[in-house]
Amino acid sequence: MSQEIGPTDAAGPRVCPIADALDIVGERWTLLVLRELAFGVSRFKEIQVNTGAPRETLSLRLRKLEEYRLIERRRYCEHPPRDEYVLTQAGQDLQPVLRSLREWGERHAAPAARA
């Protein structure tokens, strides 16, 4: 590993890529949104239903993911205006992370694992 993981100096820049990544994808609902997009779900309402995210929160998460270029918004209907969302290459690069989180959750966070 080329960079050390540890506490940061409050006066200096952070040098932890994990913390940097969590600044982007660590908010509630964000990883579930990325999961849905990885599954091929692309429309706002479907993402909202499948994740349970509140409408306003989902809008904020989608905007942030677009700002960080993890997703791209595409217009699929002009009247009324309707958009869909797709993963960019950077978003697709997170799929192994999502897979690992799912596997970890199955082993350690599922109700049977806690019993």
Predicted regions located by residue number:
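Basic, amphipathic "hinge/linker" alpha-helix immediately C-terminal to the N-terminal HTH DNA-binding motif
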Residues: 26, 77-100
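Glycine-centered, phosphate/nucleic-acid-interacting loop/turn motifs that mediate DNA/RNA or nucleotide
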Residues: 29, 69-70
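Residues within the DNA-recognition helix of helix-turn-helix
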Residues: 61
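N-terminal helix-turn-helix DNA-binding core of bacterial DNA-binding proteins
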Residues: 12-57, 78, 86
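N-terminal intrinsically disordered/low-complexity leader segments
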Residues: 1-13
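Amphipathic alpha-helical dimerization/coiled-coil segments
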Residues: 93-115
